[in-house]
Structures are given as structure tokens and as C-alpha cells.
Amino acid sequence: MEYKLEQHRHGLTVANDHNFKKDFEEFLDVITSITDQDIIDEFNKKTNTRSNSNRVLTKSISDAINKLIDERLTQKAWSRQSRIFGDRRFKDMRWTLDFAKQTNGIGTFCVEVVFNNAGSLGWNLLKPVLACEQNHVEKAIETKIGIIVLATKEMKVAGGFDNTVATFDDAPLYLSAMSNIISATPIVIIGLCAPKSFKIEHYEANYGNGRRKKAGRIVMI
């Protein structure tokens, strides 16, 4: 996949520092290693499965991209669903990071892949702050730089994403409004570009038992 980059609090400058550059390039390599065909294959794999004798259909390529990123990052020793706090009161999913990286026992990057409702973007942007800055609650991991992955507007349309999904283009506005809160944490914002060889077309699908619902299918371009 191709991508765009933005930064908050000199995120790109810090990410390219010699202490962090290797891990940052490793993350970007994972993104660029994902091809259109990889996404098509993963999308079709899920579409062709069945649950309780009904087809499992999906509307967008978000699940396919999430799975491909997960598989390739974990192969490179990035931790998935990494807890921010060690305190057991904060053990549920809302207090975890999508991914985190430690090198030589030191946390470097924390990652949120954001394909959900724009109303949740503020919380997704705050998680790196919790992971990177000092807190009176015991930390399970402490990182230095946040990475936020979003779809660009073009990817949102071509990939069949819901109209309410936050985009790369929304992030600067949120970060500007939250600048007094996200005041010190360096953050890199990555916008995933639309596939070049296909798009998702929505249609009314039969889910079985008379149920019809919008689903997506691959259309080559």
C-alpha cells in the first residue's frame, strides 16, 4: 500500500532519530509490503467462509487490512493488544494499544489502526499520550512515539468504508483542537491510499433466513 505522512509535535523528526529509525522503517515496510492482491485475497477469504450455515459477508476492506497488518507486524515481534497500564482495573480492551514495539527492553512505538467512527478518533489519539507520558497509574508499557493509521478520503470511498469512518484528513483538525492535551507526545499520522487496481462496490446481499443487508464485492478497475 502507498501512504501519506503527517506529524504532530515533530513526530517524523523523532521517528527518524537513530534510536527509533529502524523500528519506524520496519513499520513502514509492513505497510508497503501489502499489495492490492493481498487485500483482495484476504477479503475473498472472509467472504467465502460460512457461519451457522450462512455466508459471512463484509462491507469494506478494513478487516482484510487489519489482519494483514497484524500478521506482518507480529512476525516482526511487535506486540498486539498491548496493555497500557499494569493495574488490573484497566485490563479491558479500551485500555490497550493495537500494537507496541520494544527494542532491547525499551518501548519505542505504540500504534492505533483507526477504521472506526470519527467520534472515537479523539480517544484513539489520546491512547499514545497515555502510553508515552508519565502517569500516576502503574504502566504495563511505556513508549516514546505514537503512530496513528487512518484511511485517506480516497481509500474510504474505494475501500467501501462506512460514511462515518474517520480519515487521515480529519486528524489535523482533532490534533489542533486537542493541542493543549496532546502537548508533548510526538505522533506520526499515516494515511493509507486507495488501491489502484480495484474498488469495493456495495450491493444488497442475502444473508440467509430472509435477511438482506449491504455488503461489498471486489470490482477490478
Predicted regions and their residues:
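Active-site metal-binding core of divalent-cation-utilizing nuclease and nuclease-like domains
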Residues: 55-59, 67-105, 117-126, 133
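Domain-level recognition of nuclease-like catalytic cores that cleave nucleotide substrates
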Residues: 150-221
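Structural motif
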Residues: 107-109, 145
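Interdomain/boundary linker segments immediately adjacent to catalytic/signaling cores
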Residues: 1-87, 221
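Short, well-ordered coil/turn elements that cap or connect secondary structure elements
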Residues: 75, 105, 141, 182-184
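Catalytic cores of nucleic-acid endonucleases
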Residues: 115-179
